[in-house]
């Protein structure tokens, strides 16, 4: 039985695609590499043996801090190399982020293949720096190839978990015959977007809509608005069922969320996270805007009136929502997980 080490940590955008690939490799012995006290620990649970290393990014101006981070990176590379050798790992798969540096370099030192999945339209720093050490870089967006001209790449889109491909029942008290708006701040939440949305919600409720608002865990005012038609949750595991039922989403533009919107044919109003590295969420969102699947507003330009009026207009014109839904589905790649799984198999 082949042995795979998955290095995926931090946010849902890194962890969920990795879980989607893992589901297609049930004949592999899989081990998971993460970081302490992050999202992956609860999501992976006891499905796979779980290992952790401590890694940090270099976002500091302090030379002493940078040196400390560099020494920590070197230490973590050798930790992962030791893990690879002890567990007789055959191939490493990573979805990027800080943890990918240690995983890719350890795989290189161990002489085994490393497959990197870059989900964003604009490649991250880790991808740009370390793609040369990878067997292949799998791309979430076809246009990303232009930023990695000398790297072996293949476009596969971004994997989602298997439940997105089958109808999922929704365990929330929402009637079948009412419009449903879903607010998605990403796995880390989005307090500023939450504040804006709460100013708009009363108008949408008056129209008869229900709103499910995923606030994240760090919003101090998450429960400040109370109404039977307004459901707030810090996190919801059945995103497949929720988006399958939704008429419209208001969302950040992380690559994983966008893929889930496409698979479920959900029209969207996108608000890119303004502090994302190299503004990659804006580039992600533009693909959906160009396709006619979404509207996009920068956070600094979006007001409660603009958002209220746009959502109200869309709810009043189901034909517009239907057209956006059709355009969204055209962006979906239904076999992304299978393509990545095959890439991993073929690398050994």
From Swiss-Prot:
It is found in: Cell inner membrane. Gene3D superfamilies: Glycogen Phosphorylase B. Its EC number is 2.4.1.227. SUPFAM superfamilies: UDP-Glycosyltransferase/glycogen phosphorylase (SSF53756). GO terms for biological process: carbohydrate metabolic process; cell division; cell wall organization; lipid glycosylation; peptidoglycan biosynthetic process; regulation of cell shape. It catalyses: di-trans,octa-cis-undecaprenyl diphospho-N-acetyl-alpha-D-muramoyl-L-alanyl-D-glutamyl-meso-2,6-diaminopimeloyl-D-alanyl-D-alanine + UDP-N-acetyl-alpha-D-glucosamine = di-trans,octa-cis-undecaprenyl diphospho-[N-acetyl-alpha-D-glucosaminyl-(1->4)]-N-acetyl-alpha-D-muramoyl-L-alanyl-D-glutamyl-meso-2,6-diaminopimeloyl-D-alanyl-D-alanine + UDP + H(+). Pfam families: Glyco_tran_28_C, Glyco_transf_28. Its main location: membrane. GO terms for cellular component: plasma membrane. UDP-N-acetyl-alpha-D-glucosamine binds at residues 11-13, 120, 161, 187, 281. Cell wall formation. Catalyzes the transfer of a GlcNAc subunit on undecaprenyl-pyrophosphoryl-MurNAc-pentapeptide (lipid intermediate I) to form undecaprenyl-pyrophosphoryl-MurNAc-(pentapeptide)GlcNAc (lipid intermediate II). This is UDP-N-acetylglucosamine--N-acetylmuramyl-(pentapeptide) pyrophosphoryl-undecaprenol N-acetylglucosamine transferase.
